Regions:
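Feature marking well-ordered beta-strand scaffolds used for ligand recognition
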Residues: 1-156
């Protein structure tokens, strides 16, 4: 799914995992999302929910990790070694800067605007770096994993 409305003005947008062993009969086996309450994301402004994913074929990540751009909840690193029970092993939410744009919603005939991070797309490389960009003009961030995410990837 993809969040398309600001401030949670739509049903929750999830990450879905599917078994496509039989290509003509795909079957959803699990889902995952960032708990809204973990960061009051609906109140932060902008979109909150799954957007783009990256499941890298590089050996460092293949069949181990997936990364999801989650708009105002930043980028999320998921351990997918058990696709029936994906779990978050890391995340990064960029800080707002003077260049970060406002996102507005109509409220009682007037626009209510908030400055909000909108992590949009991401890419990884075979060294274990994650590159994320923000659609609200905050820029690009190059990330290096730490903690549990680094352990899942098998990086020293």
């Amino acid at each position: 799914d993809e969040a398309i409305l600001n401030e949670c003005a739509e049903p929750r947008q999830m990450v879905w995992f599917a078994d496509v062993t039989t290509e003509t009969r795909p079957m959803v086996i699990s889902s995952w999302t960032v708990p809204e309450a973990s960061g009051n994301f609906c109140e932060r402004g902008g979109r909150f929910g799954a957007h783009s994913s990256n499941e890298s074929m590089a050996p460092v990540f293949y069949k181990k990790m997936a990364f999801i751009a989650f708009f105002n909840a930043g980028v999320r690193a998921l351990d997918i070694r058990d696709p029936y029970h994906p779990k978050e092993v890391g995340y990064f939410i960029p800080s707002i800067t003077e260049k970060t744009d406002k996102r507005c919603v109509p409220v009682e005939g007037k626009d209510r605007c908030k400055v909000a991070i909108q992590t949009n797309n991401l890419e990884t490389d075979d060294r274990g770096y994650i590159y994320i960009v923000d659609r609200a003009n905050t820029g690009m961030h190059i990330l290096e994993m730490t903690g549990p995410a680094r352990a899942v990837a098998g990086l020293k």
